[in-house]
Regions:
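Blade-terminus and WD-like Trp-Asp/Gly-His loop motifs, strongest in beta-propeller folds
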Residues: 89-96, 139-149, 184-193, 259-268, ...
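Non-cleavable N-terminal signal-anchor transmembrane helices
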Residues: 52-150
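Surface-exposed loop/turn elements that mediate protein-protein interactions on large endomembrane-trafficking
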Residues: 75-83, 110-136, 158-177, 223-244, ...
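Non-cytosolic head/periplasmic domains of membrane-anchored proteins
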Residues: 137-212, 216-227, 232
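N-terminal export/targeting signals for secretion/compartment entry
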Residues: 1-77
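Short, conserved, GDST-rich strand-edge loop motifs in beta-rich repeat architectures
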Residues: 93-114, 196-220, 361-370
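Acidic, serine/threonine- and glycine-rich low-complexity intrinsically disordered segments
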Residues: 189-323
């Protein structure tokens, strides 16, 4: 595939994209950060993206026509981009990382005082090379290698965890739990699974009887976490308090959904906090608080999904917007020194120096522009180039038609 072909394919696909969404992005970001500072937030303003960047800075970029793989194979290292597809129909991948699944959120009214953001997932099917709807599951996380996923059934919190064979679409084993689960996360090696426990649906939103008084102050129902061995299904549960005044005088808050995850080395558990004084805490497997590991974990930003780079030398940071209109910080894990990389929200590392990110299209900044008009791109430390990987999102809120959220895994 030569540059002319790539450019022609990209222009053709982009011509079929959805029209820009309406304004209101800045207000939405402020509201989301104030309410829950969720991982789905899409940060501020514009990306200057040249179409010719499609052919720059990646090992090999496939057009939609040539991205067909044999059954059971997901090539490591190759870049698979579909700039005209949103949501994607065919595999999106770069370097070590692939879009293993995505979900579309829908707001469902439970009562006059409560609504729930429900997810409908599409999982990558190796046999067809496409994403296939999987309506049974309310939560899906995919293990490294993209052969197994951990799933929860529709009603949250759930009393059992399924281990789904992604080749067959069948659950290989159910893990029964006595504390109901609302969130799941694999360790980096795929051998452990952290399950966050809740007493109420963590995706619920509560509304005041009087809309003029603001949102009611409803505490999180999070109770703790399981650390489970994936091979045996065995593990232990630890209770963790949900926040408030600490013995050291600092105050912590917990979002209604605030899931736990394992640290890079798999020795500890951590979770973020939407607090100015304490933004994350680390625990041993008994739930006792411990210091941050000496691997750069102290620089982790809990709502930035990319985390530590594969070689451990960098940590993906929050929105920057200094060198470019839309950019994010990358932090040296040894020194804490910050530099910038293109992209408004860093989602996953493709290799030691490249990341998959959300970023806005060219011309989408300024008054009256559509700051929600974001797509997946590949960015690289030290480069001002971006490679479009997906088409643009539609809609103007996190539950609008045309919005979808990615689920990445190491392939």
């Amino acid at each position: 595939v030569n540059v002319d072909d790539l450019l022609r394919d990209t222009l053709r696909e982009q011509a079929a994209e959805q029209p820009p969404a309406g304004p209101g992005f800045a207000d939405w970001v402020l509201a989301v950060r104030r309410r829950r500072r969720t991982r789905q937030l899409v940060a501020a303003v514009v990306a200057t993206v040249a179409v010719v960047a499609v052919a720059v800075g990646v090992p090999q970029l496939y057009s939609g026509r040539s991205d067909v793989r044999p059954s059971g194979v997901v090539d490591r290292g190759n870049t698979s981009a579909h700039p005209g597809q949103s949501p994607p129909r065919e595999l999106i991948a770069a370097g070590r990382t692939a879009l293993a699944a995505y979900y579309i959120p829908t707001k469902v009214t439970v009562s006059a005082r409560e609504s729930v953001s429900e997810r409908t997932y599409w999982l990558f099917d190796r046999k067809t090379g496409t994403y296939v709807k999987a309506p049974k599951w309310s939560v899906v996380t995919v293990a490294p290698g993209m052969k197994t996923a951990a799933v929860l059934e529709r009603t949250l919190p759930a009393s059992r965890i399924g281990l789904l064979d992604l080749a067959t679409g069948e659950v290989k084993r159910w893990i029964q739990v006595s504390h109901k689960v609302g969130g799941l996360s694999f360790s980096d090696d795929g051998r452990k699974l952290v399950a966050t426990t809740y007493t109420h649906n963590p995706d619920a939103e509560f509304h005041p009887a009087d809309p003029n008084v603001g949102e009611p102050d409803v505490p999180s129902s999070r109770t703790g976490f399981y650390v489970l061995d994936v091979a045996s299904g065995k593990g232990s549960w630890a209770g963790v308090t949900i926040g408030g005044q600490r013995a050291d005088g600092l105050t912590t808050l917990v979002n209604y959904r605030q899931d736990f995850a394992l640290t890079r080395d798999g020795r500890y558990i951590w979770a973020g906090l939407p607090s100015d004084e304490v933004d994350k805490l680390f625990y041993d497997f008994t739930g006792a608080e411990v210091p941050a590991p000496e691997d750069g974990s102290k620089y982790l930003v809990w709502f930035v999904d990319a985390g530590l780079s594969p070689d451990g030398e960098h940590v993906a940071g929050d929105f920057a917007g200094q060198t470019w209109t839309t950019s994010s910080y990358v932090i040296d894990s040894a020194t804490g020194e910050k530099s910038e990389v293109r992209g408004q929200q860093l989602l996953a590392w493709a290799d030691d120096r490249s990341l998959i990110a959300w970023d806005i299209g060219k011309g989408d900044s300024g008054a009256g522009k559509s700051e929600f008009h974001a797509r997946l791109v590949l960015v690289t430390i030290g480069s001002d180039k971006e490679v479009p990987l997906s088409g643009f999102l539609g809609g103007s809120t996190d539950v609008s038609a045309g919005r979808w959220q990615p689920v990445f895994a190491t392939r």
